[in-house]
């Protein structure tokens, strides 16, 4: 297991597995192809290398990011569409070997985060002030509602260099 703090375009070496969680939505759409091409180049050619991308996305065509989210939470973040992601993966030389839409998961995650946040609100208020408390509570609440009632969801996308080399169809290999 290796962690590196650097621009993804500067990563060197080759890897059996690459996992990126909550990262892709911070890549500019003009670099989607570059992102997946870099993953392609970083995966080993041994036939069983896999990349798992876990990203917030929209079921609608690409559109603007919510102004509140852009200003206060994820400045410059993007919410990619399935069509943008698929096109970039195909152009990179990778093959999609698995795609899962986690529709009802993230709103529950946000609800759990909010519950824990509110249990510790007094400590957080001392450390960050009242404005932060209101902002963070609004963020967690509104995003939970957005994931429950709008077009937002989480995609979990598995990509490989060679589809025929996927280590199994049962996904048991993920847990080893």
What label would you give each PLM region?
Residues 33-50:
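A short glycine-rich, Lys/Arg-flanked "PGG" loop and its adjoining helix->strand segment in the class I
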Residues 5-19, 151:
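A short acidic, Gly/Pro-enriched loop at the edge of an enzyme's catalytic core
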Residues 55-167, 174-176:
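Substrate-binding/catalytic lobe of Class I Rossmann-like enzymes that use SAM or dcSAM, i.e.
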Residues 19-24, 52:
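A conserved beta-strand element that flanks and buttresses the S-adenosyl-L-methionine
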Residues 4, 14, 34, 138-145:
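Flexible, glycine/threonine-enriched loop-and-boundary segments that flank and lead into catalytic domains
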Residues 10, 25-27, 31:
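A short His-aromatic
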Residues 1-3, 51:
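Hydrophobic/aromatic anchor residues within beta-strands of the central parallel beta-sheet
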